[in-house]
């Protein structure tokens, strides 16, 4: 379809109305590329997809899609042989996760019959091994230790060397305390240094890395740690090399699947776009129209999507009707009506819902042409009439029986008599060629043409003579009438003058009286139709509300019953457990004889109801099914505490899992599903201390930034106690630099604590003097 009509009807602004409902960049790109088509099968497919998505939302009203970024460029780089960086891998990881979530959602979907959408859901690929490989990159853009054995080894050595450096420096802090300006370890140029008083600079052998602004403090790296620091620098280089190798290796593993991943991303975007269309339907009370095979258009209560508080109107453009001529004065909404028809057709042929009532029908047109508004060319020095006529001549050479034509103020800008004659001649030419046309004009001569000519119908926009304002209601079948005399009289013009003017009009040619009667009949019919529609809408709302309420009650009933059964079982188990403990205590005190204990326990058991058989409960069966591991599930390996992805199940029941670059064989008891872990309730504590194996993952830390001094000291005391209870070897305390009050308080507290083996500032790349690393005694 020609681009000019899309610009004239502001189709890009209409598409922008759908953007807030999109979740993916792929969906946004597909929306921006959306254009009308004349292929019936494509339009039908788009309509069917929207209807199925509506049915899906009935069962799953909170259906959503994981947000994803555009990856077309990333996949193209892979296909060209390039290696990806961490950020690009995270984009791919997100797409694979979104794909897997959609597959899981589809697998568990019930009570919805899908055909078109099923095709897209089932075309999504499953990449369990790649998902396992990509677990090596966490969301913060960090390569995990388990990405390779070599990386884990290097990082362990770095950690051990850094610990040695800290131990040496802590010993020197104690030995050389009188020579230091502060009893802390500082960091300069990435090296751990001691703040030595300038007068003692020659007493401590080592490398000078910095001098304070006052010159009183010299920052010296002691000779004892220089070699260790050089080893750490070398290990850091090895770490960078190993990370680069991992990026190359995973790039090679992903490369053969680049096209499939790109295809998955497109499908995710397509499903997102369909979802956005349905969210628009819900928000704007839009509908999926029916498709006519013979260019018949029937729009019920149609509105212009870009006009605020637009008046809804009916338009009936039957199969045999060739032209609708809208007559009447300007500013009544004729042009808006013209654009509403054109824009509704463009939206429908683009596979979008329309702002109309149920039962609306649209046709299929290969082209839509329009001459709307003042498009005169200043460069060509064309008048308004010449500009319009140039455009119309061009259009008349292109239109055919498969076109829809919209003409605004046909014949305007020249002598009224000649303009009206030209307008009628153009309309007659279009009628004979059977080209569907909607035209607006203010020439009264065209009213007679509409009445006398077959397959042509008059129409007008209603005008309220009481308020002297247009109502913007479309009146099909009723030509526009002049209200000049009535308006002049209401505005205060002398009745004598108005009477003289009325007598000058030839009564034989005055059709205003007939038009007035037609208007009254049309208004009466519209009122009846509106009443019928109101009743239909109320019935429809009532039916939907009752159905929704019935389904909700059933679901709530089943949920509450299951909760009650589970709670009852828990209470009984707790009571029996407590009774056992009580009887055990009594027995230990020899207050009861053994047979009396048995009898007492039997009586307590009678208090417990029979266990309810929940084996046939569908909700519990579904929950149990969800908990069973399957290929593609994310897991946590219990012995290592690392994440991976299940890739296959062996004949003996064991599972193969991809954990970074390492493939492992595990029994079901050796791992937990990530989803199952997320479902467990997490107890909230004021201070959390996480016990971790040395060298693996982030260390436990406490952040005191922004705290008041008293509050910070209380939290520090609680934190240290928790760390000691959990047998922590080392913790981090982030206090910031600021005024130094909290930092000094932390230092004094640690100096007093008998469980602290050593402490010092963190490396420059881990917070420097804004953080303190604490090591506890064994």
UniProtKB/Swiss-Prot annotation:
InterPro entries: DNA_mismatch_repair_MutS_C, DNA_mismatch_repair_MutS_core, DNA_mismatch_repair_MutS_sf, MSSS, MutS, MutS2, P-loop_NTPase, Smr_dom. ATP binds at residues 328-335. Coiled coil: none annotated. Its EC number is 3.1.-.-, 3.6.4.-. It comes from the Bacteria. Residues 702-777 form the Smr domain. It is an enzyme of class 3 (hydrolase). One of its GO terms (biological process) is rescue of stalled ribosome. One of its GO terms (molecular function) is ATP binding. Keywords: ATP-binding, DNA-binding, Endonuclease, Hydrolase, Nuclease, Nucleotide-binding, RNA-binding, rRNA-binding. Belongs to the DNA mismatch repair MutS family. MutS2 subfamily. Homodimer. Binds to stalled ribosomes, contacting rRNA. Endonuclease that is involved in the suppression of homologous recombination and thus may have a key role in the control of bacterial genetic diversity. This is Endonuclease MutS2.
């Amino acid at each position: 379809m020609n681009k000019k009509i899309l610009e004239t009807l502001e189709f890009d602004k209409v598409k922008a109305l759908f953007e807030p409902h999109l979740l993916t960049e792929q969906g946004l790109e597909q929306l921006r590329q959306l254009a009308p088509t004349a292929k019936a099968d494509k339009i039908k497919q788009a309509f069917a997809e929207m209807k199925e998505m509506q049915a899906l939302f009935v069962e799953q009203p909170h259906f959503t899609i994981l947000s994803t970024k555009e990856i077309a460029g990333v996949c193209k780089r892979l296909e060209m042989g390039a290696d990806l960086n961490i950020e690009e891998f995270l984009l791919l990881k997100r797409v694979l996760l979104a794909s897997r979530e959609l597959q899981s959602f589809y697998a568990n979907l019930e009570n919805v019959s899908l055909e078109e959408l099923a095709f897209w859901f089932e075309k999504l690929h499953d990449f369990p091994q790649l998902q396992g490989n990509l677990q090596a990159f966490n969301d913060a853009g960090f390569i995990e230790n388990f990405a390779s054995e070599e990386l884990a080894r290097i990082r362990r050595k770095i950690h051990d060397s850094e610990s040695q450096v800290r131990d040496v420096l802590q010993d020197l802090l104690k030995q050389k305390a009188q020579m230091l300006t502060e009893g802390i370890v500082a960091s300069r140029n990435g090296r751990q240094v001691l703040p030595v008083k300038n007068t003692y600079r020659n007493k401590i052998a080592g490398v000078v890395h910095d001098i304070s602004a006052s010159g009183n403090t010299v920052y010296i790296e002691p000779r004892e740690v220089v070699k260790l620091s050089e080893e750490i620098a070398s290990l850091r280089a090895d770490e960078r090399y190993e990370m680069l190798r991992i990026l190359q290796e995973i790039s090679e593993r992903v490369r053969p699947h680049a096209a499939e991943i790109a295809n998955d991303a497109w499908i995710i975007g397509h499903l997102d776009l369909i979802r956005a269309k349905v969210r628009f339907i819900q928000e704007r009370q839009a509908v999926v129209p029916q498709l006519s095979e013979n260019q018949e258009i029937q729009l019920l209560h149609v509105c212009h999507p870009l006009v605020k508080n637009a008046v809804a109107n009916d338009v009936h453009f039957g199969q045999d009707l060739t032209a609708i001529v809208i007559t009447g004065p300007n500013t009544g909404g004729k042009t808006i009506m013209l654009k509403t028809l054109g824009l509704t057709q463009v939206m429908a042929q683009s596979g979008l819902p329309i702002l109309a009532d149920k039962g609306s029908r649209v046709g299929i047109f290969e082209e839509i042409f329009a001459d709307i508004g003042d498009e005169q060319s200043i460069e060509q020095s064309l008048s308004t009439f010449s500009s319009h006529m140039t455009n119309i001549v061009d259009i008349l050479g292109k239109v055919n029986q498969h076109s829809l034509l919209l003409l605004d103020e046909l014949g305007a800008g020249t002598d009224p008599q000649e303009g009206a004659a030209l307008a009628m001649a153009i309309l007659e030419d279009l009628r004979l060629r059977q080209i569907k046309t909607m035209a607006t004009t203010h020439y009264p001569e065209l009213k007679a043409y509409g009445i006398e000519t077959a397959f042509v119908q008059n129409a007008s926009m209603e005008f309220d003579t009481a308020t002297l304002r247009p109502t913007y209601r479309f009146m099909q079948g009723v030509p526009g009438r002049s209200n000049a005399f009535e308006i002049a009289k209401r505005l205060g013009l002398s009745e004598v003058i108005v009477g003289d003017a009325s007598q000058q009009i030839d009564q034989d040619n005055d059709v205003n009286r007939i038009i007035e009667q037609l208007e009254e009949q049309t208004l009466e019919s519209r009122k009846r139709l509106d009443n019928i529609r109101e009743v239909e809408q109320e019935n429809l709302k009532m039916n939907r509300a009752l159905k929704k309420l019935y389904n909700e009650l059933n679901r709530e009933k089943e949920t509450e019953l299951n909760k009650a059964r589970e709670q009852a079982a828990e209470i009984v188990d707790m009571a029996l457990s407590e009774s056992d403990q009580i009887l055990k205590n009594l027995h230990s005190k020899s207050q009861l004889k053994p047979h009396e204990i048995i009898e007492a326990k039997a009586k307590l058991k009678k208090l417990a109801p029979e266990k309810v058989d929940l084996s046939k409960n569908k909700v519990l069966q579904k929950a149990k099914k969800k908990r069973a591991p399957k290929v593609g599930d994310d897991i946590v390996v219990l012995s290592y505490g690392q994440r991976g992805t299940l890739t296959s199940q062996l004949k003996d029941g064991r599972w193969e899992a991809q954990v970074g670059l390492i493939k492992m064989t595990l029994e079901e008891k050796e791992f937990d599903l990530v989803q199952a872990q997320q479902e467990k309730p997490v107890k909230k504590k004021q201070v959390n201390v996480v016990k971790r194996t040395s060298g693996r993952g982030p260390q436990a830390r406490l952040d005191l930034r922004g705290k008041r001094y008293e509050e910070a000291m209380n939290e520090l005391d609680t934190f240290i106690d928790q760390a000691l209870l959990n047998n922590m070897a080392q913790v981090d305390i982030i206090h910031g630099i600021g005024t130094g009050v909290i930092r000094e308080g932390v230092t004094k507290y640690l100096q007093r604590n008998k469980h602290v083996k050593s402490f010092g500032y963190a490396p420059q790349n881990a917070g420097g003097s804004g953080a303190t690393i604490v090591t506890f005694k064994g």
